[in-house]
Amino acid sequence: MIKSNYIVHDCETGGLDKNKNPITQYACVILDYKTLKEIDRWETYVKPYNDLVIEKKALDHTMVTMSDINSGVSVKKFVKTATTFWEQHRAKTKNRDKGRLVSVGHNIPFDHGFLDYALILENDTIENYFQPGFIDTLMLGKLTWGINGDEKITLTDCCARCKIRLTDAHGAMNDVEATADLFRWFMKKLRTGKATAAEVAEEVKRVKGQKFFEFECAK
């Protein structure tokens, strides 16, 4: 069995179109494949690149400022640092492709699109670092709570249903921390077939060791 770790990540962006709008902020945490404990984390702002447009409504939505963005790194340095970080946490296997990280996020295909655009600018691709499949907590939420069709369920909605604290929604690292807790909640259900409030609260204490995260199953 390949022991690939999980990467939970999130991009804040200058709009909704990966071909027109850039990444403005990126954050990720690495989780141990078995215990789901956090191994490492990294976050950064990214300077504007490739003449892509940063829309005002996107800044208003994410609460990221131009001052934050201009304090960030170039896209070249972002890609180099990100790929080095991802590579550090690749599982050690004879077949390097099998050791790639398992990507986790809320509506993660959205983030993948923006990340791949940035990597392609540097003659690279996310396929070199992440497994072909991914785990989308948005889809897990829709399946768990019977939400059909094209209706979306936000990270805020999912966290509210599971009593997970989410502060400063749309701040990249805050979203990542909440998504990681949401992922742990789903994994608890998958691994045990149940997730009572007491069991999940105990699981988070064991995994995180941080009391300020509220985490219990919705009634």
Q: For the regions a protein language model found, what residue spans apply to each?
A:
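Conserved non-catalytic scaffold segment of RNase H-like nuclease domains
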Residues: 2-116, 157-164, 170, 212-216
